């Protein structure tokens, strides 16, 4: 038996909005420690990792490990029927083929039940090794979203470079080029407005902007975003989900064509 009750139902709606365009079908894994998802996008370029820890739920019952295959588009349609202030409860029986979403209004004068069929989804669980990153940038999430959106009007690849001077986002396209430089800034009134750059080694890596723009759909979840970069590893773009977990997006860097030509 599985029963999860989330008072901040809007969190779950925002989580779905931030992953449904990348991943069509995925398994939600429930264990005693939390509710999680790990899935590749359809073109196997990006990986999404979600964790909502059990202690963040008002009520969390998971008698045994359960994996529920869901179509995220359909799940999102159901969650859209919940009001932003609604309490959301997720229920499923062990071995059952459906999951029930229950939406309760804050005054508890309206309760809606939506039942959705589960799917059988084959998914390999990819071990994500803990790594030491050469550079880590923490910045306001809406600023990162704006940069990705602005650069997409010029080009389709962003080069993220971290040096002693700061972090530079640049692109080039048919109409010209664009460079946006952010310097470390911790003298701010609100901690979420700070730009913090931890650089162990300088890095410069290229990424597809359409994926970066997709990742920024998680902006409503968190005021800050953390970008971890290393020359040999995929970038990690992480958004915290309230105090209860995170969404992490992993994206492999693009190999520049001219480097391939040299090889």
UniProtKB/Swiss-Prot annotation:
Q: List the InterPro entries hit by this protein, alphabetically.
A: DNA_clamp_sf, Pr_cel_nuc_antig, Pr_cel_nuc_antig_C, Pr_cel_nuc_antig_CS, Pr_cel_nuc_antig_N
Name of a matching Pfam family:
PCNA_N
Q: Where found in the cell?
A: Nucleus
Keyword annotations for this protein, in alphabetical order, are: DNA replication, DNA-binding, Nucleus
Gene3D superfamilies to which the protein is assigned, alphabetical: 3.70.10.10
Set out the biological process GO terms recorded for this chain's protein: DNA replication; regulation of DNA replication
Main subcellular location of this protein, as a coarse class: nucleus
Record HAMAP family:
DNApol_clamp_arch
- Disulfide-bonded cysteine pairs: these are none
Q: What is this protein called?
A: Proliferating cell nuclear antigen
Q: Which GO terms describe its molecular function?
A: DNA binding; DNA polymerase processivity factor activity
Gene Ontology cellular-component terms for this entry are: nucleus
Q: What does this protein do?
A: This protein is an auxiliary protein of DNA polymerase delta and is involved in the control of eukaryotic DNA replication by increasing the polymerase's processibility during elongation of the leading strand.
Q: Which PROSITE patterns match?
A: PCNA_1, PCNA_2
**Organism encoding this protein:** Brassica napus
User: Which residues mediate DNA binding here?
Assistant: 61-80
Q: Which family does it belong to?
A: Belongs to the PCNA family.
């Amino acid at each position: 038996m599985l029963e999860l009750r989330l008072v901040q139902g809007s969190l779950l709606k925002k989580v779905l909005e931030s992953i449904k365009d990348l991943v069509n079908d995925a398994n939600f894994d429930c264990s005693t420690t939390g509710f999680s998802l790990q899935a590749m996008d359809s073109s196997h370029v990006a990986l999404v990792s979600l964790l909502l820890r059990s202690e963040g739920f008002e009520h969390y019952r998971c008698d045994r490990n359960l994996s529920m295959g869901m179509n995220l588009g359909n799940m999102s349609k159901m969650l859209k029927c919940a009001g932003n202030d609604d309490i959301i409860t997720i229920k499923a029986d062990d071995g059952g083929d459906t999951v029930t979403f229950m939406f309760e209004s804050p005054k508890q004068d309206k309760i809606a039940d939506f039942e959705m069929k589960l799917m059988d989804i084959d998914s390999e669980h990819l071990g994500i090794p803990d790594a030491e990153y050469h550079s880590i940038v923490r910045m306001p999430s809406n600023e990162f979203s704006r940069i990705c959106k602005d650069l997409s009007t010029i080009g389709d690849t962003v080069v993220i470079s971290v040096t002693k001077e700061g972090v530079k986002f640049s692109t080039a396209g048919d109409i010209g080029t664009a460079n946006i430089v952010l310097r470390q800034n911790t003298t701010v009134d609100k901690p979420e407005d700070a730009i913090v750059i931890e650089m162990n080694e300088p890095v410069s890596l290229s990424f597809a902007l359409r994926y970066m723009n997709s990742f920024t759909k998680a902006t409503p979840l968190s005021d800050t975003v953390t970008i971890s970069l290393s020359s040999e590893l995929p970038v990690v773009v992480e958004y915290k989900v309230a105090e209860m977990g995170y969404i992490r997006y992993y994206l492999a860097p693009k190999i520049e064509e001219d480097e391939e030509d040299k090889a």
